[in-house]
């Protein structure tokens, strides 16, 4: 695994203004912004990264990585911060544990801790040295991404789907190129929680955007089509992130940079097939645990009985 700090990367700059015009090059790389403090889940996140919170028996970050693997991603880029050692350890082998499981012939357990791991050389880390917004976190990965399209996955957004959400997006990207984001309709009173598309054309599955607005008030929101934490982005977005302009909340917003690419890069929102859980919210996290437990053949029957026995 490669560990690269922002200082190490700063001496090696890429001229992002000289990009090719091929809008449908294969998406090989994914960025995972995982530098957040997880304050909404204190005290659980005092000593554990929020991305390591488990849904049933698997941490959120593993769900995101497995989704990326199913979409053909080959290079996994984690933008971390202080106190993320457990996350990095999760993507490394644990020889003592694996040896113990092997000695005890715990075949299923060995598979559970090794089968999904990216191969050596497929994982890179860089640091976001201060919390300056999602756009800044993505910008920190610029030299690792280079001059090619890339995905961004926010582990807080867990998607339950027959065809993984990012796989659906990659298939759509092959059709339309440019930027593709996963979107869902939300109640108008909730628009101030999300980035919202200003829609030019909408066929019910795919919406072509003419603009984006970050967390608009309901009365001025151009639509109710909100972006969730799944993106496929053209590298031109780095040209605008490079300007380090502050937006909503005084942070460098990814939405603002994406909006500026519209006109030079196609921009579409895909209504993905599946159910999204906001695991950055306690109720959403608990909801996900219930649904994913009921999906498990080894747990569903007993867990359903446990739910029926609850006295409220």
Feature annotation, model-predicted:
Residues 24-102, 106, 128, 164-168:
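N-terminal glycine-rich phosphate-binding loop and ensuing alpha1 helix
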Residues 29, 74-76, 122, 149, ...:
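Residues at the starts of beta-strands that form the adenosine-phosphate
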Residues 32, 78, 152, 181-182, ...:
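Structural beta-sheet core signal
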Residues 52, 123-125, 179, 267-269, ...:
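Conserved beta-strand scaffold positions in the cores of enzyme catalytic domains, especially
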Residues 151, 170-174, 203-305:
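Catalytic-core segments of class I nucleotidyltransferases/pyrophosphorylases
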């Amino acid at each position: 695994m490669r560990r690269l700090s922002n200082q190490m990367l700063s001496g090696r700059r890429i001229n992002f203004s000289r990009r090719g015009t091929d809008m449908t090059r294969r998406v090989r790389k994914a960025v995972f912004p995982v530098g957040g403090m997880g304050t909404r889940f204190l005290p659980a996140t005092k000593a554990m990264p929020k991305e390591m919170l488990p849904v049933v028996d698997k941490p959120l970050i593993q769900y995101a990585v497995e989704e990326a693997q199913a979409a053909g991603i080959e290079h996994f880029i984690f933008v971390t911060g202080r106190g993320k050692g457990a996350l990095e350890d999760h993507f490394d082998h644990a020889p003592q544990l694996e040896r113990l499981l092997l000695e005890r012939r715990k075949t299923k357990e060995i598979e559970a801790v090794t089968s999904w791991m990216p191969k050596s050389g497929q994982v890179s880390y860089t640091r976001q040295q201060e919390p300056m917004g999602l756009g800044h976190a993505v910008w920190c990965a610029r030299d690792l991404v280079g001059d090619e399209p890339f995905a961004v996955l926010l582990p807080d957004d867990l998607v339950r789907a027959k065809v993984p959400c990012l796989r659906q997006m990659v298939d759509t990207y092959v059709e339309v190129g440019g930027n593709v984001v996963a979107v869902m309709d939300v109640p108008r009173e909730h628009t101030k929680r999300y980035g919202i598309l200003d829609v030019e054309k909408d066929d019910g599955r795919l919406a072509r955007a003419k603009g984006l607005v970050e967390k608009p008030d309901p009365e001025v929101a151009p639509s109710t089509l909100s972006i969730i934490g799944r993106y496929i982005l053209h590298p031109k977005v780095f040209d605008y992130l490079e300007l380090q302009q502050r937006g909503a909340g005084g942070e460098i917003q990814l939405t603002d940079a994406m909006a500026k690419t519209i006109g030079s890069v196609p921009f579409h929102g895909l209504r993905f097939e599946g159910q999204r859980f906001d695991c950055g919210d306690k109720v959403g996290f608990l909801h996900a645990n219930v649904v994913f437990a009921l999906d498990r053949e080894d747990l569903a029957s007993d867990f359903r009985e446990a739910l029926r026995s609850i006295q409220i």
